[in-house]
Amino acid sequence: MKVVAFERSVQGTGASRRLRNSGKTPAIIYGAGAEPKLIELDHNALYHALKKEAFHSSILDIEVAGKVEKALLRDFQLHPFKQLVLHVDFQRVSAKEKIHVKVPLHFLNQETAPGVKLGHGIVNHILNDVEVSCLPADLPEFIEVDLGTLEIGQTLHIADLKLPKGVTILTHGGDENPAVANISVPAGEKSAAAEEGAAAAGEDKPAA
């Protein structure tokens, strides 16, 4: 994904305000052993790009003065109540160094999963993205999660995912194989089953 940017020589609160008033957004690109570079981008183009999932999880080609640098979107600041991007941070990437990036999960075959189609269960997404480690060339835009064989009451874990070549998932918090999604019994059916069980227990209870 290509991003056209322009070098900027001034910085500070006043300069940034004037830049935004002219329809531009201040930004910085840093990392990969090179000096940080102050840049500016067209605000409207940036605002719409931020709505795209791929903009957050892809290697971006940032063109400045005819030269292209590969980078990741690392941070951005939005105005509290205006549709305004205040600042953006990009991090350069090296083709030979692994990067850590959060990648979205795309869930497939939810409607045809046995637990939904036959058991009338409810799909619960426990994770919506995962942090991966890989070389920039191997970075996927998303990872597919196939729920096509999941039965009611079953859970899909990180270890069950099919990962692209060269990609590993980083886990945190001590759980090496966290849950990704499951199919649960609807709350109404749980209550009905509990009532039926209680009624059956009452019928089986001997008279006093």
Curated annotation (Swiss-Prot):
InterPro entries xrefs: Rbsml_bL25/Gln-tRNA_synth_N, Ribosomal_bL25/Gln-tRNA_synth, Ribosomal_bL25_b-dom, Ribosomal_bL25_C, Ribosomal_bL25_long, Ribosomal_bL25_short, Ribosomal_L25_dom, Ribosomal_uL5_bac-type
Disulfide bonds: none
GO cellular component: cytosolic large ribosomal subunit
Presence of the UniProt keyword Ribonucleoprotein in the record: yes
Compositional bias annotation for Low complexity: 186-201
Keywords linked to the UniProt accession: Ribonucleoprotein, Ribosomal protein, RNA-binding, rRNA-binding
Gene3D superfamilies, per database record: Ribosomal protein L25, beta domain (2.170.120.20), Ribosomal Protein L25, Chain P (2.40.240.10)
The protein's assembly and partners: Part of the 50S ribosomal subunit; part of the 5S rRNA/L5/L18/L25 subcomplex. Contacts the 5S rRNA. Binds to the 5S rRNA independently of L5 and L18.
Protein name: Large ribosomal subunit protein bL25
Function in brief: This is one of the proteins that binds to the 5S RNA in the ribosome where it forms part of the central protuberance.
Region (Disordered): 186-208
HAMAP family reported in the protein's UniProt record: Ribosomal_bL25, Ribosomal_bL25_CTC
A Gene Ontology biological process term: translation
Family per record: Belongs to the bacterial ribosomal protein bL25 family. CTC subfamily.
SUPFAM superfamilies: Ribosomal protein L25-like (SSF50715)
Gene Ontology MF, one: 5S rRNA binding
